[in-house]
A protein has these predicted regions:
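Multi-pass membrane glycosyltransferase architecture that uses lipid-linked
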Residues: 13-240, 288-460
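Compositionally biased low-complexity segments, especially N-terminal hydrophobic helices
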Residues: 3-10
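Luminal/periplasmic active-site loops of membrane-embedded glycosylation enzymes
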Residues: 67-80, 239-285, 293, 420-423
Length: 460
Protein backbone atom coordinates (compact mmCIF):
# COMPACT_ATOMS: atom_id res chain seq x y z
CA UNK A 1 0.00 0.00 0.00
CA UNK A 2 1.54 3.27 -1.08
CA UNK A 3 0.75 6.77 0.01
CA UNK A 4 -1.63 8.86 -2.04
CA UNK A 5 1.19 11.15 -3.12
CA UNK A 6 3.45 8.40 -4.43
CA UNK A 7 4.30 8.64 -8.10
CA UNK A 8 4.98 5.85 -10.56
CA UNK A 9 8.70 6.42 -10.15
CA UNK A 10 8.84 5.97 -6.38
CA UNK A 11 10.45 2.81 -4.95
CA UNK A 12 7.21 2.03 -3.08
CA UNK A 13 5.07 2.03 -6.23
CA UNK A 14 7.73 0.16 -8.23
CA UNK A 15 8.13 -2.51 -5.54
CA UNK A 16 4.36 -2.94 -5.30
CA UNK A 17 4.10 -3.54 -9.06
CA UNK A 18 7.02 -5.97 -9.02
CA UNK A 19 5.67 -7.93 -6.05
CA UNK A 20 2.24 -8.14 -7.71
CA UNK A 21 3.71 -9.47 -10.96
CA UNK A 22 5.83 -11.94 -9.04
CA UNK A 23 2.83 -13.16 -7.06
CA UNK A 24 0.78 -13.66 -10.23
CA UNK A 25 3.47 -15.96 -11.69
CA UNK A 26 2.43 -18.56 -9.09
CA UNK A 27 -1.20 -19.45 -9.71
CA UNK A 28 -3.56 -20.44 -6.90
CA UNK A 29 -3.56 -24.02 -8.16
CA UNK A 30 0.24 -24.21 -8.04
CA UNK A 31 0.41 -22.73 -4.57
CA UNK A 32 -2.02 -25.37 -3.32
CA UNK A 33 -0.24 -28.25 -5.05
CA UNK A 34 2.13 -30.18 -2.80
CA UNK A 35 3.61 -31.88 -5.89
CA UNK A 36 4.42 -28.55 -7.57
CA UNK A 37 5.96 -27.11 -4.40
CA UNK A 38 8.03 -30.27 -3.87
CA UNK A 39 9.29 -30.13 -7.46
CA UNK A 40 10.05 -26.41 -7.08
CA UNK A 41 11.96 -27.06 -3.85
CA UNK A 42 14.05 -29.88 -5.36
CA UNK A 43 14.83 -27.83 -8.49
CA UNK A 44 15.95 -24.84 -6.43
CA UNK A 45 18.10 -26.98 -4.13
CA UNK A 46 19.67 -28.75 -7.11
CA UNK A 47 20.58 -25.32 -8.52
CA UNK A 48 22.23 -24.33 -5.24
CA UNK A 49 24.26 -27.53 -5.02
CA UNK A 50 25.26 -27.34 -8.69
CA UNK A 51 26.44 -23.76 -8.20
CA UNK A 52 28.53 -24.87 -5.25
CA UNK A 53 30.03 -27.86 -7.04
CA UNK A 54 30.80 -26.33 -10.44
CA UNK A 55 31.04 -22.55 -10.00
CA UNK A 56 31.95 -21.61 -6.42
CA UNK A 57 33.56 -24.60 -4.66
CA UNK A 58 35.65 -22.19 -2.56
CA UNK A 59 32.53 -21.22 -0.59
CA UNK A 60 33.06 -24.31 1.57
CA UNK A 61 36.04 -22.61 3.21
CA UNK A 62 34.14 -21.90 6.43
CA UNK A 63 33.04 -25.53 6.74
CA UNK A 64 36.66 -26.64 6.33
CA UNK A 65 37.54 -24.14 9.06
CA UNK A 66 34.91 -25.72 11.33
CA UNK A 67 36.40 -29.14 10.60
CA UNK A 68 39.93 -28.00 11.42
CA UNK A 69 38.80 -26.50 14.72
CA UNK A 70 36.82 -29.59 15.74
CA UNK A 71 39.75 -31.80 14.77
CA UNK A 72 41.97 -30.13 17.38
CA UNK A 73 39.18 -29.96 19.97
CA UNK A 74 40.36 -33.17 21.59
CA UNK A 75 43.89 -31.83 22.08
CA UNK A 76 43.20 -28.12 22.76
CA UNK A 77 40.03 -28.61 24.79
CA UNK A 78 36.71 -26.74 24.49
CA UNK A 79 38.03 -23.68 26.35
CA UNK A 80 40.33 -22.91 23.40
CA UNK A 81 38.08 -24.00 20.53
CA UNK A 82 35.94 -21.68 18.38
CA UNK A 83 36.10 -18.92 20.98
CA UNK A 84 34.29 -16.51 18.67
CA UNK A 85 31.07 -18.54 18.96
CA UNK A 86 28.90 -19.55 21.94
CA UNK A 87 29.97 -22.85 23.50
CA UNK A 88 26.96 -24.89 22.20
CA UNK A 89 28.22 -24.28 18.66
CA UNK A 90 30.96 -26.80 19.42
CA UNK A 91 28.33 -29.48 20.03
CA UNK A 92 26.53 -28.60 16.79
CA UNK A 93 29.73 -28.71 14.73
CA UNK A 94 30.81 -31.96 16.36
CA UNK A 95 27.83 -33.80 14.82
CA UNK A 96 29.08 -33.76 11.18
CA UNK A 97 32.54 -34.71 12.45
CA UNK A 98 31.13 -37.89 13.96
CA UNK A 99 28.89 -38.60 10.97
CA UNK A 100 31.79 -38.00 8.56
CA UNK A 101 34.10 -40.36 10.52
CA UNK A 102 36.63 -37.58 11.14
CA UNK A 103 37.35 -37.11 7.43
CA UNK A 104 37.39 -33.61 5.89
CA UNK A 105 35.38 -34.52 2.79
CA UNK A 106 32.99 -36.54 4.93
CA UNK A 107 32.62 -33.56 7.27
CA UNK A 108 31.70 -31.17 4.44
CA UNK A 109 29.15 -33.60 3.00
CA UNK A 110 27.63 -34.34 6.42
CA UNK A 111 27.41 -30.61 7.22
CA UNK A 112 25.62 -29.82 3.96
CA UNK A 113 23.23 -32.75 4.46
CA UNK A 114 22.42 -31.50 7.97
CA UNK A 115 21.55 -28.05 6.62
CA UNK A 116 19.50 -29.56 3.78
CA UNK A 117 17.53 -31.65 6.27
CA UNK A 118 16.88 -28.57 8.41
CA UNK A 119 15.76 -26.65 5.33
CA UNK A 120 13.40 -29.46 4.29
CA UNK A 121 11.90 -29.73 7.78
CA UNK A 122 11.28 -25.99 7.96
CA UNK A 123 9.70 -26.00 4.50
CA UNK A 124 7.38 -28.82 5.59
CA UNK A 125 6.39 -26.92 8.75
CA UNK A 126 5.59 -23.80 6.69
CA UNK A 127 3.34 -25.84 4.41
CA UNK A 128 1.46 -27.50 7.27
CA UNK A 129 1.15 -24.41 9.48
CA UNK A 130 0.58 -21.71 6.90
CA UNK A 131 -3.15 -22.15 6.35
CA UNK A 132 -4.32 -20.48 3.15
CA UNK A 133 -0.84 -18.99 2.57
CA UNK A 134 1.25 -22.08 3.25
CA UNK A 135 2.14 -22.25 -0.43
CA UNK A 136 3.32 -18.63 -0.46
CA UNK A 137 5.42 -19.30 2.64
CA UNK A 138 7.14 -22.29 1.00
CA UNK A 139 7.70 -20.41 -2.27
CA UNK A 140 9.28 -17.45 -0.50
CA UNK A 141 11.55 -19.66 1.60
CA UNK A 142 12.53 -21.79 -1.40
CA UNK A 143 13.38 -18.72 -3.48
CA UNK A 144 15.10 -16.99 -0.59
CA UNK A 145 17.63 -19.77 -0.01
CA UNK A 146 18.15 -20.06 -3.77
CA UNK A 147 19.06 -16.36 -3.75
CA UNK A 148 21.43 -16.92 -0.83
CA UNK A 149 23.16 -19.58 -2.92
CA UNK A 150 25.70 -22.13 -1.64
CA UNK A 151 26.32 -20.03 1.48
CA UNK A 152 22.91 -21.22 2.73
CA UNK A 153 24.22 -24.74 3.33
CA UNK A 154 27.83 -23.84 4.09
CA UNK A 155 27.26 -21.71 7.21
CA UNK A 156 25.39 -22.59 10.39
CA UNK A 157 23.44 -19.28 10.36
CA UNK A 158 20.64 -21.29 8.75
CA UNK A 159 20.04 -22.78 12.21
CA UNK A 160 19.29 -19.41 13.81
CA UNK A 161 17.10 -18.34 10.89
CA UNK A 162 15.01 -21.50 11.12
CA UNK A 163 14.77 -21.36 14.92
CA UNK A 164 13.51 -17.76 14.69
CA UNK A 165 10.93 -18.85 12.13
CA UNK A 166 9.85 -21.82 14.23
CA UNK A 167 9.47 -19.56 17.29
CA UNK A 168 6.88 -17.57 15.36
CA UNK A 169 5.13 -20.70 14.08
CA UNK A 170 4.89 -22.23 17.57
CA UNK A 171 3.63 -18.92 18.91
CA UNK A 172 1.02 -19.01 16.15
CA UNK A 173 -0.02 -22.49 17.31
CA UNK A 174 -0.23 -21.26 20.92
CA UNK A 175 2.79 -23.21 22.12
CA UNK A 176 4.31 -20.19 23.84
CA UNK A 177 6.76 -22.09 26.05
CA UNK A 178 8.19 -23.93 23.04
CA UNK A 179 8.51 -20.62 21.17
CA UNK A 180 10.47 -19.16 24.09
CA UNK A 181 12.68 -22.23 24.29
CA UNK A 182 13.47 -22.11 20.57
CA UNK A 183 14.40 -18.45 20.83
CA UNK A 184 16.81 -19.29 23.66
CA UNK A 185 18.31 -22.11 21.59
CA UNK A 186 18.87 -19.64 18.77
CA UNK A 187 20.65 -17.33 21.20
CA UNK A 188 22.88 -20.22 22.28
CA UNK A 189 24.12 -20.57 18.69
CA UNK A 190 24.26 -16.88 17.75
CA UNK A 191 23.77 -14.31 20.47
CA UNK A 192 21.44 -11.93 18.61
CA UNK A 193 18.19 -14.02 18.86
CA UNK A 194 18.08 -13.12 22.57
CA UNK A 195 16.86 -9.70 21.40
CA UNK A 196 13.76 -11.34 19.90
CA UNK A 197 12.30 -12.44 23.25
CA UNK A 198 10.00 -9.37 23.69
CA UNK A 199 8.33 -10.21 20.37
CA UNK A 200 7.00 -13.39 21.99
CA UNK A 201 4.79 -11.37 24.36
CA UNK A 202 1.82 -10.09 22.31
CA UNK A 203 -0.86 -12.23 23.97
CA UNK A 204 -2.50 -12.45 27.40
CA UNK A 205 -0.57 -12.67 30.67
CA UNK A 206 -0.60 -16.47 30.66
CA UNK A 207 1.01 -16.58 27.22
CA UNK A 208 3.61 -14.00 28.27
CA UNK A 209 4.49 -16.07 31.33
CA UNK A 210 4.86 -19.30 29.35
CA UNK A 211 6.99 -17.70 26.64
CA UNK A 212 9.23 -16.05 29.21
CA UNK A 213 9.50 -19.24 31.26
CA UNK A 214 10.45 -21.25 28.18
CA UNK A 215 13.03 -18.65 27.20
CA UNK A 216 14.59 -18.35 30.66
CA UNK A 217 14.62 -22.05 31.54
CA UNK A 218 16.15 -23.07 28.21
CA UNK A 219 18.62 -20.21 28.34
CA UNK A 220 19.71 -21.02 31.89
CA UNK A 221 20.07 -24.70 30.98
CA UNK A 222 22.33 -23.85 28.02
CA UNK A 223 24.39 -21.47 30.17
CA UNK A 224 24.77 -24.11 32.88
CA UNK A 225 25.81 -26.84 30.46
CA UNK A 226 28.24 -24.48 28.72
CA UNK A 227 29.77 -23.51 32.04
CA UNK A 228 30.25 -27.13 33.07
CA UNK A 229 31.68 -28.09 29.68
CA UNK A 230 34.14 -25.28 28.97
CA UNK A 231 34.30 -22.92 31.94
CA UNK A 232 33.55 -19.28 32.67
CA UNK A 233 36.12 -17.66 30.36
CA UNK A 234 34.89 -19.66 27.38
CA UNK A 235 31.29 -18.75 28.23
CA UNK A 236 32.13 -15.04 27.95
CA UNK A 237 34.60 -15.20 25.05
CA UNK A 238 32.02 -14.47 22.29
CA UNK A 239 31.13 -11.20 24.05
CA UNK A 240 34.71 -9.91 23.92
CA UNK A 241 35.89 -11.52 20.68
CA UNK A 242 34.44 -8.84 18.38
CA UNK A 243 35.79 -5.82 20.24
CA UNK A 244 38.84 -5.21 18.08
CA UNK A 245 37.20 -5.66 14.69
CA UNK A 246 37.65 -3.10 11.94
CA UNK A 247 35.36 -1.97 9.12
CA UNK A 248 34.35 -5.02 7.08
CA UNK A 249 34.27 -4.28 3.36
CA UNK A 250 30.67 -5.50 2.89
CA UNK A 251 29.20 -3.32 5.63
CA UNK A 252 26.94 -0.42 4.75
CA UNK A 253 29.41 1.90 6.46
CA UNK A 254 32.21 0.75 4.15
CA UNK A 255 30.33 1.68 0.96
CA UNK A 256 31.96 5.11 0.50
CA UNK A 257 35.55 3.97 1.27
CA UNK A 258 35.11 1.01 -1.08
CA UNK A 259 33.89 3.32 -3.86
CA UNK A 260 36.78 5.71 -3.17
CA UNK A 261 39.20 2.78 -3.41
CA UNK A 262 38.14 2.14 -7.01
CA UNK A 263 39.55 5.52 -8.09
CA UNK A 264 42.37 5.89 -5.56
CA UNK A 265 43.58 2.49 -4.43
CA UNK A 266 46.87 3.85 -3.06
CA UNK A 267 45.09 5.52 -0.13
CA UNK A 268 43.10 2.44 0.90
CA UNK A 269 44.13 -1.05 1.93
CA UNK A 270 42.00 -4.18 2.19
CA UNK A 271 43.44 -6.77 4.57
CA UNK A 272 42.38 -10.12 6.02
CA UNK A 273 42.01 -9.77 9.78
CA UNK A 274 42.41 -12.41 12.47
CA UNK A 275 38.61 -12.56 12.51
CA UNK A 276 38.69 -14.17 9.03
CA UNK A 277 37.11 -11.05 7.53
CA UNK A 278 38.35 -8.56 4.94
CA UNK A 279 38.53 -5.04 6.36
CA UNK A 280 39.25 -1.70 4.72
CA UNK A 281 41.63 0.92 6.09
CA UNK A 282 42.25 4.46 4.90
CA UNK A 283 41.09 8.09 5.14
CA UNK A 284 37.87 8.50 7.09
CA UNK A 285 37.59 4.87 8.15
CA UNK A 286 38.18 5.53 11.85
CA UNK A 287 35.41 8.15 11.82
CA UNK A 288 33.05 5.67 10.19
CA UNK A 289 33.95 3.05 12.79
CA UNK A 290 33.06 5.47 15.59
CA UNK A 291 29.82 6.41 13.84
CA UNK A 292 28.88 2.76 13.39
CA UNK A 293 29.33 2.08 17.11
CA UNK A 294 27.09 5.05 17.97
CA UNK A 295 24.40 4.14 15.45
CA UNK A 296 24.49 0.46 16.43
CA UNK A 297 23.85 1.31 20.08
CA UNK A 298 21.26 3.91 19.08
CA UNK A 299 19.51 1.48 16.75
CA UNK A 300 19.20 -1.14 19.47
CA UNK A 301 17.91 1.53 21.86
CA UNK A 302 15.21 2.47 19.34
CA UNK A 303 14.31 -1.22 18.94
CA UNK A 304 13.94 -1.58 22.71
CA UNK A 305 11.78 1.56 22.78
CA UNK A 306 9.59 0.14 20.01
CA UNK A 307 9.13 -3.06 22.01
CA UNK A 308 8.19 -1.09 25.13
CA UNK A 309 5.64 1.10 23.32
CA UNK A 310 4.14 -1.97 21.61
CA UNK A 311 3.78 -3.87 24.89
CA UNK A 312 2.41 -0.79 26.69
CA UNK A 313 -0.12 -0.23 23.90
CA UNK A 314 -1.39 -3.81 24.26
CA UNK A 315 -3.49 -5.90 21.88
CA UNK A 316 -0.37 -6.79 19.92
CA UNK A 317 -1.02 -8.78 16.76
CA UNK A 318 1.33 -11.61 15.83
CA UNK A 319 2.13 -10.06 12.44
CA UNK A 320 3.29 -6.97 14.35
CA UNK A 321 5.57 -9.20 16.43
CA UNK A 322 7.13 -10.53 13.22
CA UNK A 323 7.68 -6.99 11.92
CA UNK A 324 9.41 -6.03 15.17
CA UNK A 325 11.62 -9.12 14.85
CA UNK A 326 12.61 -8.00 11.35
CA UNK A 327 13.18 -4.48 12.63
CA UNK A 328 15.68 -5.71 15.22
CA UNK A 329 17.49 -7.87 12.65
CA UNK A 330 17.73 -5.27 9.89
CA UNK A 331 18.82 -2.56 12.35
CA UNK A 332 21.68 -4.82 13.48
CA UNK A 333 22.67 -5.49 9.87
CA UNK A 334 22.59 -1.89 8.64
CA UNK A 335 24.21 -0.18 11.63
CA UNK A 336 26.92 -2.78 12.28
CA UNK A 337 30.54 -2.33 11.20
CA UNK A 338 30.53 -5.96 10.11
CA UNK A 339 28.38 -7.54 7.42
CA UNK A 340 29.02 -11.07 6.22
CA UNK A 341 26.87 -12.61 3.44
CA UNK A 342 25.29 -15.12 5.81
CA UNK A 343 23.72 -12.27 7.80
CA UNK A 344 21.04 -12.01 5.11
CA UNK A 345 19.87 -15.48 6.15
CA UNK A 346 18.67 -14.08 9.46
CA UNK A 347 15.77 -12.34 7.71
CA UNK A 348 14.52 -15.40 5.83
CA UNK A 349 13.03 -17.57 8.57
CA UNK A 350 10.88 -14.87 10.21
CA UNK A 351 9.80 -13.50 6.83
CA UNK A 352 8.63 -16.94 5.65
CA UNK A 353 6.82 -17.46 8.96
CA UNK A 354 5.02 -14.14 8.41
CA UNK A 355 3.19 -15.70 5.45
CA UNK A 356 2.08 -18.53 7.72
CA UNK A 357 0.81 -15.97 10.24
CA UNK A 358 -1.28 -14.20 7.59
CA UNK A 359 -2.51 -17.52 6.24
CA UNK A 360 -4.36 -18.24 9.48
CA UNK A 361 -6.06 -14.83 9.52
CA UNK A 362 -9.55 -14.03 8.28
CA UNK A 363 -9.65 -12.68 4.72
CA UNK A 364 -12.79 -10.68 5.46
CA UNK A 365 -11.09 -7.77 7.21
CA UNK A 366 -9.27 -4.84 5.61
CA UNK A 367 -6.21 -5.36 7.82
CA UNK A 368 -5.48 -8.66 6.08
CA UNK A 369 -5.10 -7.06 2.65
CA UNK A 370 -3.06 -4.15 3.98
CA UNK A 371 -0.69 -6.52 5.79
CA UNK A 372 -0.45 -8.82 2.78
CA UNK A 373 0.48 -5.93 0.49
CA UNK A 374 3.16 -4.75 2.91
CA UNK A 375 4.47 -8.29 3.36
CA UNK A 376 4.71 -8.89 -0.40
CA UNK A 377 6.56 -5.61 -0.92
CA UNK A 378 9.00 -6.26 1.91
CA UNK A 379 9.57 -9.82 0.68
CA UNK A 380 10.41 -8.56 -2.79
CA UNK A 381 13.03 -6.15 -1.48
CA UNK A 382 14.54 -8.87 0.75
CA UNK A 383 14.83 -11.19 -2.25
CA UNK A 384 16.49 -8.45 -4.33
CA UNK A 385 18.97 -7.67 -1.54
CA UNK A 386 19.71 -11.37 -1.08
CA UNK A 387 20.32 -11.94 -4.80
CA UNK A 388 22.65 -8.94 -4.97
CA UNK A 389 24.49 -10.41 -1.97
CA UNK A 390 24.99 -13.61 -3.98
CA UNK A 391 26.43 -11.56 -6.85
CA UNK A 392 28.81 -9.88 -4.39
CA UNK A 393 29.77 -13.11 -2.61
CA UNK A 394 30.95 -15.41 -3.94
CA UNK A 395 30.53 -14.35 -7.60
CA UNK A 396 32.55 -11.10 -7.65
CA UNK A 397 34.22 -11.15 -4.25
CA UNK A 398 37.76 -11.76 -5.50
CA UNK A 399 37.68 -8.50 -7.45
CA UNK A 400 36.83 -6.61 -4.25
CA UNK A 401 39.75 -7.94 -2.23
CA UNK A 402 42.54 -8.83 -4.67
CA UNK A 403 45.19 -6.61 -6.27
CA UNK A 404 47.09 -9.31 -8.07
CA UNK A 405 46.73 -8.30 -11.72
CA UNK A 406 45.22 -5.82 -14.19
CA UNK A 407 42.06 -7.95 -14.55
CA UNK A 408 41.30 -7.62 -10.84
CA UNK A 409 41.75 -3.85 -11.02
CA UNK A 410 39.52 -3.49 -14.08
CA UNK A 411 36.69 -5.55 -12.60
CA UNK A 412 36.93 -3.96 -9.17
CA UNK A 413 34.75 -1.00 -10.20
CA UNK A 414 31.69 -3.00 -11.41
CA UNK A 415 32.08 -5.36 -8.44
CA UNK A 416 32.09 -2.38 -6.06
CA UNK A 417 29.02 -0.94 -7.80
CA UNK A 418 27.26 -4.26 -7.14
CA UNK A 419 28.24 -4.01 -3.48
CA UNK A 420 26.98 -0.42 -3.29
CA UNK A 421 23.69 -1.41 -4.96
CA UNK A 422 23.24 -4.25 -2.46
CA UNK A 423 23.83 -1.90 0.45
CA UNK A 424 21.35 0.63 -0.95
CA UNK A 425 18.68 -2.07 -1.23
CA UNK A 426 19.41 -3.23 2.33
CA UNK A 427 18.80 0.35 3.50
CA UNK A 428 15.52 0.33 1.52
CA UNK A 429 14.55 -2.83 3.43
CA UNK A 430 15.24 -0.97 6.68
CA UNK A 431 13.12 2.00 5.54
CA UNK A 432 10.28 -0.33 4.51
CA UNK A 433 10.33 -2.05 7.90
CA UNK A 434 10.43 1.30 9.71
CA UNK A 435 7.36 2.46 7.76
CA UNK A 436 5.50 -0.70 8.76
CA UNK A 437 6.48 -0.35 12.43
CA UNK A 438 5.46 3.32 12.37
CA UNK A 439 2.05 2.37 10.94
CA UNK A 440 1.09 0.64 14.20
CA UNK A 441 3.27 2.50 16.72
CA UNK A 442 2.72 6.10 15.66
CA UNK A 443 0.98 8.14 18.40
CA UNK A 444 -2.40 8.19 16.65
CA UNK A 445 -2.42 4.40 16.18
CA UNK A 446 -1.31 3.75 19.77
CA UNK A 447 -3.97 6.12 21.10
CA UNK A 448 -6.70 4.43 19.04
CA UNK A 449 -5.79 0.96 20.34
CA UNK A 450 -5.62 2.10 23.97
CA UNK A 451 -9.00 3.86 23.67
CA UNK A 452 -10.45 0.67 22.21
CA UNK A 453 -8.99 -1.30 25.12
CA UNK A 454 -10.53 1.07 27.66
CA UNK A 455 -13.88 0.76 25.91
CA UNK A 456 -13.73 -3.03 26.11
CA UNK A 457 -12.54 -3.09 29.72
CA UNK A 458 -15.01 -0.46 30.98
CA UNK A 459 -17.96 -1.84 33.00
CA UNK A 460 -21.23 -1.99 31.10
Amino acid sequence: VTSAGATAATPARFSTRMSRQFTLSFTRERLRSAKFLLFFWFAARFLILATWAFITPATQGDVVYYYQKIQVLFSDGPANTLQEYPTPVIWVLLIPYLIGFGNEHGYVIAFVCMMLALDALFSWSLWHSGGSMGGQAVVFWTLFLAMVGPTAFLRFDLITSVLAGWSIIFLLRRHSAVAGGLTALGASVKLWPALLWPALLPGPARQKFRATAGFLLTGLAMVGLSLLYAGWDRLLSPLTWQQGRGLQIESVWATLPMLARTVNSDNYAVTLSRYQAFEIWGPGVNTLLSASDIFFAGGLAVAVLAYLVWLWRGHGRLIEAVVLVQFVIIVMIVTNKTFSPQYMMWLGGPQAAAFAVLGTRSHHVEEFYVDRSRLNTLSMWILVATFLTLLVYPISYDFLVNDWNVRDSLLRFPATLLLAARNIVVVIVLIDVIRWVWSFLRPRAVKAVRQRRRGVEAPQ
